[in-house]
Amino acid sequence: MAVVSADKQKVWNCYTMPEHITKWNFADPRWHCPSATNDLKVGGRYFARMEAKDGSFGFDFEAIYSEIFEGEHFTYAFGGRVAHVTFKDLKGKTEVCVMFDPETENPIALQRQGWQAILDNFKNYTETT
């Protein structure tokens, strides 16, 4: 969860528009997100390429939207798992909360840390854009 010092519409736009996603969607400063697409509709596809800046490793994150309530929340499925993202107005600030199904290969604490690091990058980017 992160509380972003920006109105909900700006936060929603920065979270869902590909030209913004590529600026914040990575957990470590040694990584980046060189490309992203987002078809924000039920059945639409979210895609983000994440890779190490030195080119040593990379992966594609793909998800399909199952629920969207514009400006409020969305749910998408990826690799047999689901994530739900909510946006709550806090009088000029916006709370963003990401709930996700963990995968089985890595400890849950490590997964939470990674998702939170990406959310922290998002907060920093949105507040300075």
Cite the ranges covered by each PLM segment.
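Hydrophobic pocket/interface hotspot
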Residues: 11-12, 21, 46-48, 65, ...
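Hydrophobic ligand-binding cavity/cleft-lining segments
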Residues: 1-31
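Intrinsic-disorder/low-complexity, polar/charged segments enriched in Ser/Thr/Lys/Arg/Asp/Glu/Gln
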Residues: 1, 8, 33, 45, ...
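Beta-strand/loop substructures that line and gate deep hydrophobic ligand-binding cavities in soluble
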Residues: 72-118, 122-124
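A short, amphipathic edge element
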Residues: 26-35, 80-82
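Generic structural detector for well-ordered beta-strands
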Residues: 1-5, 39, 49, 64, ...
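Glycine-rich portal/gate segments that line the openings of hydrophobic small-molecule binding cavities
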Residues: 32-76
